């Protein structure tokens, strides 16, 4: 019984007496096996029936007995039938599913290779060097491990595990009020608007040491755990009683003060400013008189006046003495200030090209103290030196170049440090900056009125010039085209 098989038998090529043939063939097929159906599954010229055989030999006997046999005018075709469409579809569907899985895997691999190739092409050198590709974890993290989040990274060929430190200070919650916002940080405590402690900043577990290597010596600095543990803020130390005392004292001080009444200003500073302005106006008037003086004045007279120090008005002297008493600060003073009034271009150019005629001598001193440490007994007389040199040259009979005149001005002691007025280059720059072109200041004084008055005419002129330029360019282009 273990060798019992069931087969679907195909009977075909039946064109004559189909009903009689099917009824007689059913009885004859029963001799070789057990027919599972009471009749054939009929179609146009063929039929099917399921028969159970004891072994394969019974099926072979049946096929030899009836295949290619003439039966009632029909040449029979008997053989094992092909499986029905449902079974074939099931087998083919299972086969297709397996093939689809393989094809999808191949397609994914191909698409991934193409994606990585395009991503590699789009990356810059910095991305190739610094960006490290990672992946998202597939399984969710356990609840007990949420506080100890780590990540793995490939460092120099070895896999390292690092801990993700919490850097977020505070977040946003929808059901919280404005006073619940954490905004105050005092004594390593985060506090909200109600002055409640929300979070504590504690570095006791994260003790680190810093080492500085310097050859054979090493300096190690460790972090103290109890730093700022006993210190408190001034706001924390201040009790309510002290705050009330301070408020009472401020109330007593400001009780009788009228905030609406304007305060009276001290006019001492304004008086000093008015005196300074008066002195400056007087100096400007004197400078204007000197600039507008006739050109044929005696030059020696101007030299003598320039060498002598200018006398200050009495008011300015008193003011300078008062300033010296208030502020003991040394301020270098010069003999002559640059005038801010009217400027004469002729006088400026004359001073520029003849600087030696009226060059002011500076009274600038680098050190205010007297030169007590200088031995003036050993000073060399310049006239005596010139006479000795001339006598020696006469005795030798040599003709030498004249000795340059050495300045004996006592004020020029600090040869390394000299004021602006004694520098030939800077004086020239200053004089050139005073030269002004005539009429430049009044050129654009009434520019708005002139623009709105001539706007239409100027626009028409510009358009006409533009048209002429375009015509001229077209003519040139047409001529060049004809030549080609």
From Swiss-Prot:
<protein>
    <recommendedName>
        <fullName>60S ribosome subunit biogenesis protein NOP8</fullName>
    </recommendedName>
</protein>
<dbReference type="InterPro" id="IPR000504">
    <property type="entry name" value="RRM_dom"/>
</dbReference>
<dbReference type="GO" id="GO:0005634">
    <property type="term" value="C:nucleus"/>
</dbReference>
<keyword id="KW-0597">Phosphoprotein</keyword>
<feature type="modified residue" description="Phosphoserine">
    <location>
        <position position="370"/>
    </location>
</feature>
<keyword id="KW-0694">RNA-binding</keyword>
<comment type="subunit">
    <text>Interacts with NIP7 and RRP43. Together with DBP6, URB1, URB2 and RSA3, forms an RNA-independent complex, which is required during early maturation of nascent 60S ribosomal subunits.</text>
</comment>
<keyword id="KW-0539">Nucleus</keyword>
<dbReference type="GO" id="GO:0003723">
    <property type="term" value="F:RNA binding"/>
</dbReference>
<keyword id="KW-0690">Ribosome biogenesis</keyword>
<feature type="region of interest" description="Disordered">
    <location>
        <begin position="260"/>
        <end position="330"/>
    </location>
</feature>
<feature type="compositionally biased region" description="Acidic residues">
    <location>
        <begin position="320"/>
        <end position="329"/>
    </location>
</feature>
<feature type="domain" description="RRM">
    <location>
        <begin position="7"/>
        <end position="83"/>
    </location>
</feature>
<dbReference type="GO" id="GO:0008428">
    <property type="term" value="F:ribonuclease inhibitor activity"/>
</dbReference>
<dbReference type="InterPro" id="IPR035979">
    <property type="entry name" value="RBD_domain_sf"/>
</dbReference>
<feature type="modified residue" description="Phosphoserine">
    <location>
        <position position="234"/>
    </location>
</feature>
<dbReference type="GO" id="GO:0000463">
    <property type="term" value="P:maturation of LSU-rRNA from tricistronic rRNA transcript (SSU-rRNA, 5.8S rRNA, LSU-rRNA)"/>
</dbReference>
<dbReference type="GO" id="GO:0042273">
    <property type="term" value="P:ribosomal large subunit biogenesis"/>
</dbReference>
<dbReference type="InterPro" id="IPR034138">
    <property type="entry name" value="NOP8_RRM"/>
</dbReference>
<dbReference type="GO" id="GO:0005730">
    <property type="term" value="C:nucleolus"/>
</dbReference>
<comment type="function">
    <text>Required for 60S ribosomal subunit synthesis. May be involved in assembly reactions occurring within late pre-ribosomal particles.</text>
</comment>
<dbReference type="InterPro" id="IPR012677">
    <property type="entry name" value="Nucleotide-bd_a/b_plait_sf"/>
</dbReference>
<feature type="modified residue" description="Phosphoserine">
    <location>
        <position position="239"/>
    </location>
</feature>
<feature type="modified residue" description="Phosphoserine">
    <location>
        <position position="268"/>
    </location>
</feature>
């Amino acid at each position: 019984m273990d060798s019992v098989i069931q087969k679907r038998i195909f009977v075909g090529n039946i064109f004559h007496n189909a009903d009689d043939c099917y009824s007689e063939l059913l009885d004859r097929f029963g001799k070789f096996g057990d027919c599972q159906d009471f009749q054939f599954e009929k179609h146009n010229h063929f039929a099917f029936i399921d028969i159970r055989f004891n072994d394969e030999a019974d099926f072979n006997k049946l096929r030899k007995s009836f295949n290619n046999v003439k039966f009632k005018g029909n040449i029979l075709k008997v053989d094992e039938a092909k499986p029905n469409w449902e079974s074939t579809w099931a087998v083919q569907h299972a086969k297709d599913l397996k093939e689809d899985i393989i094809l999808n895997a191949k397609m994914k691999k191909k698409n991934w290779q193409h994606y990585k190739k395009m991503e590699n092409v789009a990356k810059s050198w910095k991305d190739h060097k610094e960006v490290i590709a990672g992946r998202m974890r597939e399984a969710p993290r356990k609840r007990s491990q949420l506080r100890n989040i780590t990540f793995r990274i490939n460092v120099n060929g070895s896999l390292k595990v690092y801990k993700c430190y919490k850097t977020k200070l505070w977040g946003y919650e929808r059901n919280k009020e404005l006073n619940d916002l954490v905004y105050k940080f005092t004594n390593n405590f985060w506090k909200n608007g109600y002055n409640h402690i929300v979070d504590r900043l504690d570095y006791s577990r994260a003790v680190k040491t810093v080492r500085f290597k310097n050859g054979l010596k090493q300096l190690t600095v460790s972090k103290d755990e109890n730093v700022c543990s006993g210190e408190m803020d001034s706001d924390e130390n201040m009790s309510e009683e002290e705050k009330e005392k301070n408020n009472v004292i401020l109330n007593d001080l400001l009780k009788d003060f009228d905030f609406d009444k304007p305060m009276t200003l001290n006019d001492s500073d304004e008086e000093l400013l008015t005196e300074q302005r008066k002195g400056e106006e007087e100096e400007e008037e004197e400078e204007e008189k000197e600039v507008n003086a006739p050109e044929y004045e005696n030059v020696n007279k101007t030299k003598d006046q320039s060498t002598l120090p200018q006398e200050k008005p009495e008011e300015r002297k008193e003011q300078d003495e008062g300033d010296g008493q208030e502020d003991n600060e040394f301020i270098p003073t010069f003999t002559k200030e640059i005038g801010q009034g009217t400027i004469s271009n002729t006088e400026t150019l004359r001073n520029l090209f003849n600087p030696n005629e009226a060059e002011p001598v500076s009274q600038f001193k680098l050190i205010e103290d007297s030169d007590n440490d200088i031995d003036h007994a050993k000073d060399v007389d310049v006239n005596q030196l010139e006479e000795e040199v001339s006598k020696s040259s006469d005795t030798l009979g040599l003709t030498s170049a004249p000795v340059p005149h050495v300045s004996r001005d006592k004020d020029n002691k600090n040869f390394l440090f000299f004021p602006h007025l004694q520098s030939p280059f800077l004086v020239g720059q200053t004089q050139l900056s005073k030269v002004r072109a005539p009429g430049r200041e009044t050129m654009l004084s009434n520019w708005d009125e002139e623009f709105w008055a001539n706007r239409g005419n100027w626009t028409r002129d510009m358009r006409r010039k533009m048209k002429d330029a375009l015509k001229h360019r077209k003519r040139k282009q047409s001529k060049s085209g004809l030549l080609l």
